[in-house]
Amino acid sequence: MAERGGAGGGPGGAGGGSSQRGSGVAQSPQQQPPQQPSQPQQPTPPKLAQATSSSSSTSAAAASSSSSSTSTSMAVAVASGSAPPGGPGPGRTPAPVQMNLYATWEVDRSSSSCVPRLFSLTLKKLVMLKEMDKDLNSVVIAVKLQGSKRILRSNEIILPASGLVETELQLTFSLQYPHFLKRDANKLQIMLQRRKRYKNRTILGYKTLAVGLINMAEVMQHPNEGALVLGLHSNVKDVSVPVAEIKIYSLSSQPIDHEGIKSKLSDRSPDIDNYSEEEEESFSSEQEGSDDPLHGQDLFYEDEDLRKVKKTRRKLTSTSAITRQPNIKQKFVALLKRFKVSDEVGFGLEHVSREQIREVEEDLDELYDSLEMYNPSDSGPEMEETESILSTPKPKLKPFFEGMSQSSSQTEIGSLNSKGSLGKDTTSPMELAALEKVKSTWIKNQDDSLTETDTLEITDQDMFGDASTSLVVPEKVKTPMKSSKADLQGSASPSKVEGTHTPRQKRSTPLKERQLSKPLSERTNSSDSERSPDLGHSTQIPRKVVYDQLNQILVSDAALPENVILVNTTDWQGQYVAELLQDQRKPVVCTCSTVEVQAVLSALLTRIQRYCNCNSSMPRPVKVAAVGSQSYLSSILRFFVKSLASKTPDWLGHMRFLIVPLGSHPVAKYLGSVDSRYSSTFLDSAWRDLFSRSEPPVSEPLDVVGRVMQYVNGATTTHQLPVAEAMLTCRHKFPDEDSYQKFIPFIGVVKVGLVEDSPSTAGDGDDSPVVSLTVPSTSPPSSSGLSRDATATPPSSPSMSSALAIVGSPNSPYGDVIGLQVDYWLGHPGERRREGDKRDASSKNTLKSVFRSVQVSRLPHAGEAQLSGTMAMTVVTKEKNKKVPTIFLSKKPREKEVDSKSQVIEGISRLICSAKQQQTMLRVSIDGVEWSDIKFFQLAAQWPTHVKHFPVGLFSGSKPT
C-alpha cells in the first residue's frame, strides 16, 4: 500500500514515515502549499527516484491507509496539470485541478459472493457551502469503502481565502474493489478531509470534515454519465449539516474481464501451486509490457512463430509451465488454423503435403508433452482438481451453448473451421483430448459435417437449462435408431466423434482410454452426479437439428408460437409420426434424449419470459404436444416440475400439454375416460393397431396428421392432473458409501415386483434413464425375445389387468414373487377395500406378504373428472394351493388364477415399500421409467412445491364416456 506523498510535509513527510510496504509516491514541487515554504521536503525513496526521473512532468498522490493496516493491496495515484504555485492570482481564471488516481484493493478470495469490480468516478467541481476554519487553506478528497481500512486520497486542493468557493476539478478515481453480492456492504464514502494540526503545526493524520455515501449496488445497475450532485454532510450533535457539494461527471462499476489479453498481463491472482505474498503485493512492471519471453511471446501463435515458441517451451521447467496453462487455448487455435480449408478446395487431403503432415505431428507431439507436464500422474482425481489453476474461479452464470464448440463433432465444426477459435473454459486436459478427437474426426469424416456449418440463431439465453451444467464429448450414444431416415440419422447424436484418429493415435489413444476408464462421476467432475436423476445426460448435448427446428418455430420475441409438437424419435413410431408432420410443415421438434427435451422446454420458457417482459398483457397458453410413450411424458413432467419450482405460480398457466399416446399409456387411457372425443381420436382400435406393429406400415392406413392436428387445434380446456412424489433411496455404487435419495414426480403409475424387462426404459442408481425416452412397451426390442402381447394395449385401469399382465415375465430378477413390506397411511377420504372392512385412518397400516406385483396409481378413477388427494394401490399376492382330494372336485380345477389374490386399497396419502430381506434391491417403474438398485421407496400423494398439478389439454365440451 503506497503512502501518500506529503504535501505540506510534517514529521515523517508523507504519512509520517510509516513502515507500510508498497511503492512510494513523490510529490511535485508545484503542489507545495505556499504557506509552508520553510519546511523541508521529504526525501524521495531510492526506488521511486528512478520512476520520478523518467517522467518529470507528472506528480503523484497516493492511496493511504491507517497505520495499523497490514494489507498487501497496491495503490498508485498520478496527478497532472495541477494549479500553479501560489494558487490562482487575482484576475486569473483558475485551471481545474487535474488528478488521476488508481488503486487495487484486496478481494476476499475465500468468499464466493465477493467479486472484483472496477469502479470509475470523475469529479468536476467542489462547492463549499459552509465556511470552515479560518486557517483552512487546503482540503483533500478521499474515497473509502464502508467497513474497510483502505483509503485513496487525492493531492491537497488549495482553497482561496474567500471562504465559500467553487473549485473546478478534473479528478478521476479508478478502483478495483471487492463487491459483495449477498450483503449490503457496498457503500463508498466520499470524504472531505484536511490535515490534522497542533499549535499551528501539521501533524500525522487527517480530520474528516464531511462525508457522502454512494451505493455501489445502484451504480452497478444504473451507471451515470451525466451531471450528478453529491452532498457532503457533517454531524454536529447528531444533526446532519451540509458542508459541501461535489458535482460528479461520470459514475460506473464494471466487471473485470479476465479473458482479455490485458487482464492476462495484469491479473495478480496467485497460482494455486505458486502462491507468494511478494507476487500479490507488487504491481510489477515486468508483467506489464515486458520483453521477457515468459510473459510476452505466448500471446499469439501464428504459423511462422510456432517453431520458435516450441523451442523455447522445451526449455521451461514444469513449474513455469503450470502457471501458463491457459496458453493451451492459443495453441489449439493455431493447430486448428493449420487445418483450415477453403470451400473452393474442398475437404479432401490431396493438397496437404507430407511436410505439412509431419509438422502437424510435431505440433501434436509437443502439445501432448506439455499436457503430460501439467498432469504428471495418471491417477484420476488430479485431472479434475486442477481444472482451473490460474486463479480461483469467479462466480458467474454459464450460458447453455458454452463449451459446445469443444465437444460437438457436428454442431460446431463449421465455426471451428471458419473462426479458428475456441470457447471458454477449455483448459482441462480431458476437454483438450476431446478437441483432438473432434479435429481428427473432421479430417477423416468431412462429408458428415458439410451440412452442419450453418450459424445458429437461437441465443445463449434461449438454451439456458439444467442440461448446461456439464457438456463433454459423449463416449457412447444411447439412442438406437431403427429407421434409415437421413434427417434423423445424419445428426442423431454426437457419436461420430468415435472412430478414426489422427497420425498421433499412439499417443492420444492411451489418454482417451485412461479418461473413459474412470467412473462417470469422476469424468464429469460433478458432486451432484450421484443424486441427479439425469446423470447419464451429462455426456450428451442436443443435436443441431433440434436447434434448427426451434429456430423455425421461435421466430420472434414479439410473438409466441401457438403450439409446439415434441416427438420422441428414438423408435419407428415417433419417426413415422414426425415425418408425416414435417411433410405438412407442422411445428415439430424431434427429440432423442432428455437433454433435448430440456433444451426445447427451456428455450420455450425463456421466450415466454421475454414476452412477459415486453408486454403488459398475459400471453396465451402455449400448447406443447408430447408425442410418445408414458416414459416420454415423464421426462417432460420432471423438467416442468423442476423448472417452475423457482418461478411464481402464475407460470403454471403459461403452458398446456397435449398427450398423443404411442403405445401403452395409462394417463392417455384416463383422459379417454373423461373425454369421449379424445378417446375416439387416440384410443380406438385403428390407432392402437397401427402403433402396435414391429415396423412402420408401407402406406398410411389412417390420417395420423389429421388426428394430431385436430387435437392440437381443438384442445381448449385445461384438465389439471395431480402431481405425486416418489422418493427413491438408492444403493451407492461404492460399497463403503452411504445410500442417497432421488425425488421424482409422477402423475401415472408406480410399479414394483415383476415388472416387464424393458431395456429401453431402464435406469438405475448409478445411471439415469438416458434411454427412458426410447422404445415404448408396444414395440419389442430387437435383442429381446419377451412376449409383449399382454402389453400391446393400455391397461384397463390402475387395477389387476396391468399387474397380472406382467406375471409371466421370464427375465425378472425376483423369479415369480418377491417378499415385500408395504406401510401406508390413509388420507381424509378413508380406505375402501374390496373386502369391506375398515381400519383406523390415523395409524399406520402394514402389509407383509409374498407379492407378485404392487402397483400404485395417482390417477383418479376412470370417468371421474374431479380430482382426489389420495392414491390407490393394487397388490397381487401369492396364495398357497390348498390340497383338496380330487374325489370332491365337481368341476375342472382352475388354472393359475387360484394362486393369486388381488386387493385394491384406496385413499392412501403416503406409502413406504421395502423388501423383506435387507440385501434385496428393488426395481421400480415410475411412469414407464425403470429405476434399479432401490433399497426402499416412499410415495406421497402431493408434490411438496407449489407445482402441484400438470396442465393437460382436452377437447372443449367433451363428456365423460
UniProtKB/Swiss-Prot annotation:
Residues 274-291 have a biased composition (Acidic residues). GO terms for biological process: lymphocyte homeostasis; protein localization to Golgi apparatus; protein localization to plasma membrane. Pfam families: C2_PACS_N, Pacs-1. One of its GO terms (molecular function) is transmembrane transporter binding. The modification Phosphotyrosine is found at residue 249. Its main location: Golgi. Transmembrane segments: none annotated. Keywords: Acetylation, Coiled coil, Golgi apparatus, Phosphoprotein. It is found in: Golgi apparatus, trans-Golgi network. Residues 1-19 have a biased composition (Gly residues). InterPro entries: Phosphofurin_acidic_CS-1. The modification N-acetylalanine is found at residue 2. Residues 404-426 have a biased composition (Polar residues). The modification Phosphothreonine is found at residues 44, 502. Residues 1-70, 76-95, 260-297, 375-426, 475-540, 758-802 are annotated as: Disordered. The keyword Acetylation applies. Associates with AP-1 and AP-3 but not with AP-2 complexes. Interacts with FURIN. Forms a ternary complex with furin and AP-1. Interacts with PKD2 (via acidic region). Interacts with SORL1. Interacts with WDR37. This is Phosphofurin acidic cluster sorting protein 1.
